[in-house]
Amino acid sequence: MAARVLAFLLALALAWPAAAQQAPLSDSDRAAIRDVISRQVEAFRRDDGNAAFSFASPDVQRLFGTAQTFMDMVRKGYRPVYRPRVFDFGNIVEMNGQPTQRVHVVGPDGRRVNALYPMTRLPDGSWRIDGCFLQSPEEHQV
């Protein structure tokens, strides 16, 4: 009896990560994710802080508080995505339980970087950007 209970608990523990994973993204989800990111980058190019901030997740909005504070951070620390010369979408992978869009970017200085955009789905089904991480192309690929 104890062996059966132990076997059941082991099977449950092994199945837990699979059950906790999100359902695969649909083609429309992938398109929506890319659209949100594209629209934010276009807002950066126009210096439209309110529009750019609107594509950030509620957590990111709480963290920065205002569109102005958010834009100041982007201008100072995220120059490649603020003023990209090239902005090419790569694949979407799962990182830390979130769909994460990889983008190959050439910044205004000609330097290549990979931008990783973790995404979050809101209760209404829409997608928002939950952060952005820049890495050099030489760094470990996701």
Spans of features found by a protein language model:
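Positively charged n-region of N-terminal signal peptides that target proteins for export
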Residues: 1-5
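Bacterial N-terminal signal peptides
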Residues: 7-15
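Sec/Tat signal peptide C-region and signal peptidase I cleavage site
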Residues: 16-20
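Short solvent-exposed beta->alpha transition segments
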Residues: 23-24, 31-35, 49-98
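N-terminal capping segments
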Residues: 29, 36-37, 43
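Short helix-adjacent coil turns
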Residues: 40, 44-51
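Exposed beta-sheet edge and beta->alpha loop/turn motif
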Residues: 91-142
